[in-house]
């Protein structure tokens, strides 16, 4: 068994069992991958794939277990490489982050600018997507960190560090009926209007939908997007009432939009940073955490980096005073 065989195995799985696509991604040939997979199956004496002719149609039960072990082995190999790099080239490397548009557009620019000043030789990679897409990148071992809000159930293999809280805001055109009578903003009134919000808010497990469900209300979500700028555009068009993160509200937006803090209508949500539980964090990775979540002292970051369960991380975070991100919402009225 070789690392190349495991790499080919994971490449095929991560490309939907399409050997041609995997070969293109791995810069090798389709026959070469097929040969290596057959050799791997013969060596371990187990059928990894169910086949129909020359096509792979599914992983066998044994194959599913083997893929899980292969991912762990490749992560362990990467950890060994990271340790070697840490000892020989502490100021060089790559930091790969998967996150949402809101974090990438409104939160990370200042932090990544500071990080780049400290580590100019560290290459930065930023992947944007939904929580589900971020989870897929994590599962494929393609990123160092995941940054998202809610959706913790999608990341059972990560240690998740709570970083900051935020409360949703409600956006309308300035001539909207809710803007004229903002003092009486309630979930019941919101449910009377078409709503425009984030894709993840349409997940049945989201605190957004649960808030309405707790009041036996059915919101009229007519449009969802990953991008807060897109949501604001459609609010301006009159498609619906927007519900977005406060970090995405710019002061210029208030020239033609009415904004109302929805604290009390919806639960406060927490943005977290996560990394694989068995990952060796290089020093520059720990320093990024310190920049993104400065309320986490260095000694707690060290403990979180080696914590064997999320319960341990949650215990470490118990006494932390999480900051609240407000963007340009300071001074906005709060919903009644």
Specify the residue positions occupied by each region the protein language model found.
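Central regulatory/effector-binding core of bacterial HTH transcription factors
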Residues: 92-154, 224-225
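Short beta-strand-centered segments that line the small-molecule binding cleft or hinge
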Residues: 87, 110-114, 132-168, 172, ...
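Hydrophobic/proline-rich hinge and linker segments of small-molecule sensing/allosteric domains
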Residues: 159-200, 268-278, 293-297
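Secondary-structure junction motif
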Residues: 179-180, 185, 194-215, 281-290, ...
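C-terminal effector-binding regulatory domain of bacterial HTH transcription factors
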Residues: 246-254, 264-336
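A short LG(V/I)-centered, amphipathic sequence patch enriched
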Residues: 41-61
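Beta-alpha-beta core module
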Residues: 155-162, 166, 229-278
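Short helix-boundary/capping micro-motifs
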Residues: 12-29
């Amino acid at each position: 068994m070789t690392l190349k065989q495991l790499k080919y195995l994971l490449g095929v799985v991560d490309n939907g069992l399409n050997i041609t696509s995997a070969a293109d991604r791995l810069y090798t040939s389709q026959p070469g991958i097929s040969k290596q997979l057959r050799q791997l199956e013969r060596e371990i004496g187990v059928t990894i794939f169910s086949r129909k002719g020359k096509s792979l149609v599914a992983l066998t039960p044994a194959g599913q277990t083997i893929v899980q072990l292969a991912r762990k082995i490749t992560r362990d190999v990467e950890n060994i490489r990271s340790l070697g790099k840490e000892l020989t080239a502490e100021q060089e490397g790559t930091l790969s982050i998967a996150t949402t548009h809101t974090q990438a557009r409104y939160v990370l620019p200042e932090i990544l600018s500071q990080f780049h000043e400290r580590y100019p030789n560290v290459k930065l990679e930023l992947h944007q997507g939904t929580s589900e897409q971020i989870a897929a990148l994590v599962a494929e071992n393609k990123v160092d960190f995941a940054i998202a809000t809610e959706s913790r159930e999608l990341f059972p293999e990560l240690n998740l560090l709570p970083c900051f809280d935020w409360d949703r805001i409600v956006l309308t055109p300035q001539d909207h009926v809710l803007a004229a009578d903002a003092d009486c903003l309630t979930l019941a009134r919101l449910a009377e209007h078409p709503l425009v919000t984030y894709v993840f808010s349409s997940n049945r497990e989201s605190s957004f939908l649960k808030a309405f469900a707790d009041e036996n209300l059915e919101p009229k979500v007519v449009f969802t997007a990953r991008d807060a700028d897109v949501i604001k555009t459609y609010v301006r068009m009159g498609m619906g009432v927007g519900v977005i993160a406060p970090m995405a509200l710019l002061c210029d937006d208030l020239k033609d939009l009415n904004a109302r803090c929805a604290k009390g209508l919806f639960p406060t949500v927490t943005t977290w940073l996560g990394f694989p539980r068995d990952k060796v964090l290089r020093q520059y990775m720990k320093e990024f955490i310190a920049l993104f979540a400065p309320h986490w002292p260095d000694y707690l970051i060290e403990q979180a980096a080696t914590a064997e369960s999320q319960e341990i991380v949650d215990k470490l975070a118990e006494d932390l005073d999480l900051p609240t991100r407000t963007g340009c919402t300071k001074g906005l009225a709060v919903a009644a």
